[in-house]
Design a protein with these regions (language model features):
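N-terminal glycine-rich phosphate-binding loop and ensuing alpha1 helix
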Residues: 1-63, 70-72, 77
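Conserved beta-loop-beta/alpha segment of the NTase-like Rossmann-fold superfamily
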Residues: 77-153
Length: 153
């Protein structure tokens, strides 16, 4: 089962590539926590949707971490991936999450999950997502959103 990881954001508000920033005691990134939790839940292919603008930096920090555990693929989300007749010459921002998921469609062969590389998801979320996706047979359209109850914690 495939997990699409939306990681093409440039981090303009953050001031850098938030998805590659070490936060754990051994330099783990939010992305590391997510990928390892997804693998533990049963996902066996990770497709990173990245930008060509930082692909060398991204692959330098990510490549080799997960390939021994799962199938890892990299696809690009850039303005240049749009057909020329659809491009807006004044636009510099990416075209959103749906467009990013479409970039990974070559590697989707059944039910799949989608996460943002810069968000933290608890490990239970990946298990809930994987377990639900496992129940899907031949659905043309089915969706699940793993949500959290907001409370004072």
């Amino acid at each position: 089962m495939t997990l699409i990881v939306l990681a093409a954001t440039m981090g303009n508000k953050y001031g850098g590539l938030k998805q590659l920033e070490g936060i754990g005691p051994n330099g783990e990134t939010i992305l590391d926590f997510s990928v390892f939790d997804a693998i533990r839940a049963g996902f066996n292919r990770i497709v990173f949707v990245i930008s060509k603008h930082f692909d060398v930096e991204f692959k330098k920090l990510v490549s080799g971490k997960y390939e021994h555990l799962v199938d890892v693929r990299y696809v690009y989300q850039d303005i240049e991936t749009l057909p020329i007749e659809k491009r807006n010459s004044k636009r510099t921002a990416l075209y959103g999450s749906v467009r990013a998921v479409l970039m990974g469609r070559e590697w989707i062969d059944g039910p799949f999950g989608v996460i943002n590389a810069v968000n933290f998801y608890q490990k239970e979320s990946f298990q809930l997502l994987h377990d639900h996706l496992q129940t899907l047979k031949d659905a043309d359209f089915d969706a699940v959103n793993v949500c959290y109850r907001l409370a004072n914690v």
